[in-house]
A protein has these predicted regions:
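Short alpha-helical DNA-recognition segment
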Residues: 21-41
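Alpha-helix N-cap/helix-initiation sites
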Residues: 22-26, 49-50, 68
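Short, charged recognition helix plus adjacent turn
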Residues: 65-81
Length: 81
């Protein structure tokens, strides 16, 4: 079973890879997510496990690739990105 910390580490690394490997600090990522840096650190270390993250991951795993892209694009629009 995947741990919540694995989800956050995978996503953090994917965002860094998107930026051509340019490191993104935990402080910057926390700011972008609008959470305290300590909270984000705890998520990555597995000290705190937001239940919603695991639930969202499980839901996304139920979708096909094209359905995931559709959902992500909808979320981008809602976030204004």
């Amino acid at each position: 079973m995947i741990e919540t910390s694995d989800i956050f580490n995978l996503l953090h690394n994917a965002v860094e890879a998107k930026n051509i490997g340019k490191k993104i600090s935990q402080a910057k990522m926390a700011e972008d997510l609008d959470v305290p840096m300590r909270t984000y650190q705890d998520w990555r270390l597995g000290n705190s496990k937001p239940q919603a993250a695991a639930a969202v991951c499980k839901l996304l795993c139920e979708l096909d690739d094209d359905e995931i892209l559709f959902v992500v694009n909808k979320m981008r629009k809602l976030l204004g990105k």
